[in-house]
């Protein structure tokens, strides 16, 4: 009736996502997955920012989102230590914080949603030890230094390799980007680097490496290549024999949006949520859908 408020109207909320970068296809897919899932909740307005791979800019964006009055912050921190202070401050203001994929130091957040990077890295190492017969030179394509997935994908891999003196590892930083990987690999190959296998901490970097190999007249299928994420490009490469295996690495966008809705509704949520990862080979590539 006129003048009488709707006592049953849902409370409206503003959720902000401070993303590290949208130049990376996996990170863009993560934001879009969150956006699509929030469409199920008409009382939630969703906004996001592009940190352009700049830690200081991501910090600034978090501050701007808080100033805009977000009811919940979602963030995938570019660097663990550098983002800890600002994220903890937001959490201490009683603004819920959902971390997607990447963590921080301490427990200044509401929930952390991610696959198990340590387990993935150990499985990748064990696979390469088997195919290389415990000896050889591995090129390790490293993601963003300082990000928790990079730290875990590096440390757990090298821990498995450490007891094997006939294994050597050369790391190069590709920042999870094709272009950065191509530049770094071209530079190494110009210096005469030879290697027996590639451990790529993302399938985007594996794709960049394959482009360089082909340019040099090297068949990617002649070298064991391990990737992580299992994007459509990796699925096709595995089918074609140009990549050995990959591990699915879901973005957690859907789970993040649903957890955010639960938090805003006053529900208790776990401090940590581990997402499943599947090892994909030529045998099951047709049965496992790529993450995007």
Where would I find each of the regions flagged by the language model?
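Short beta-strand elements in bilobed, periplasmic/extracellular small-molecule ligand-binding domains
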Residues: 38-51, 137-140, 158-178, 220
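Hydrophobic alpha-helical segments within soluble ligand-binding/sensing domains
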Residues: 8, 15, 58, 113-138, ...
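Hydrophobic alpha-helical
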Residues: 72-91, 156-157, 170, 174-236
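Exported/periplasmic ABC-transporter solute-binding proteins
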Residues: 196-197, 203, 207-274, 281-285
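Flexible loop/hinge segments that line or gate small-molecule binding clefts
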Residues: 80-119, 137, 143, 230-240, ...
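Short, solvent-exposed amphipathic alpha-helices that sit
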Residues: 26-40, 44, 120-124, 148-167, ...
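Hinge/cleft segment of the Venus flytrap/periplasmic-binding protein
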Residues: 1-13, 141, 145, 149, ...
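Extracytoplasmic "Venus flytrap"
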Residues: 3, 7-8, 13-41, 46-64, ...
């Amino acid at each position: 009736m006129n003048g009488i408020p709707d006592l049953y109207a849902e409370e409206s909320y503003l959720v902000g996502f401070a993303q590290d970068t949208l130049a990376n296809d996996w990170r863009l897919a993560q934001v879009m997955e969150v956006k699509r899932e929030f469409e199920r909740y008409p009382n939630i307005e969703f906004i996001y920012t592009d940190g352009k791979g700049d830690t200081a800019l991501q910090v600034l964006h978090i501050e701007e989102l808080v100033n805009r009055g977000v009811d919940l912050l979602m963030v995938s921190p570019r660097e663990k230590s550098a983002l800890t202070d600002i994220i903890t401050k937001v959490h201490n203001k009683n603004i819920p914080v959902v971390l997607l994929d990447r963590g921080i130091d301490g427990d200044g957040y509401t929930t952390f949603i991610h696959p198990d990077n340590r387990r993935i890295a150990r499985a990748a190492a064990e696979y390469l030890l088997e195919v290389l017969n415990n000896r050889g030179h591995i090129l390790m394509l490293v993601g963003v230094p300082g990000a928790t997935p990079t730290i875990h994908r590096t440390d757990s891999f090298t821990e498995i390799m450490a007891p094997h003196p006939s294994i050597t590892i050369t790391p190069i930083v590709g920042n999870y980007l094709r272009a950065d990987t191509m530049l770094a690999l071209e530079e190494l190959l110009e210096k005469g680097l030879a290697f027996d296998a590639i451990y790529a901490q993302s399938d985007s970097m594996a794709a960049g490496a394959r482009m360089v190999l082909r340019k040099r007249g090297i068949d990617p299928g002649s070298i064991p290549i391990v990737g992580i994420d299992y994007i459509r490009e990796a699925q096709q490469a595995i089918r074609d024999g140009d990549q050995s295996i990959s591990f699915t690495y879901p973005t957690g966008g859907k789970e993040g949006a649903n957890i955010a809705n639960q938090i805003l509704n006053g529900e208790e949520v776990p401090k940590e949520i581990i997402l499943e990862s599947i090892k994909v080979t030529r045998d099951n590539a047709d049965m496992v859908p790529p993450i995007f």
